Amino acid sequence: TWTEAIDAMPSNLQMMFVHAYQSYLFNEMLSMRIERGLPINMPVEGDVVIPLDPNGNPQHENPVMTTAKNIDLVARQIRAGRAFVTGALFGSDSILAEGEMGEIERKVIEDNGLKAEDFVIPGLPRCSSKGGRRELMCPVKSIGSEFREDGYTLRFSLPKGNYATCLMREFMKSEMRDY
């Protein structure tokens, strides 16, 4: 059966399938947000924002819903680098945004024919995912560069869950397949 085939794989590879699909959905939501002209670096009403701790680590356990009453304060926190606007990593217990971003998140989920319970897999419980939120932008830390005769070296660090290939594409302005 398909469950036996997946169960035969290492557990980290099993979860990679789930995380890849969640990332695909996240990227669809992010693309729609950009297409609608919504900022990714500033909040709009209904956005879920994640504050950072004093060490700069996202506090996913303390999401803040952006409302008309708190939008100015939330925007100040984001401008100061103490919080980030997020998008859904869809799962069984996902907190979805409200307002226009909530509409986008729900549309992507609906267009893909998904329900929250689809991320609970009784036959493979370790592949179940509760979901969460991911920052729409990530800070690039410790960036440095060096020109040499034989090429160019770019050094940087990214928070966990972010991909250097995506950042490199922005620097190189070429498709990842061309690297």
Regions inferred by a protein language model and the residue ranges of each:
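Non-catalytic, substrate/partner-engaging modules appended to enzymatic cores
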Residues: 1-179
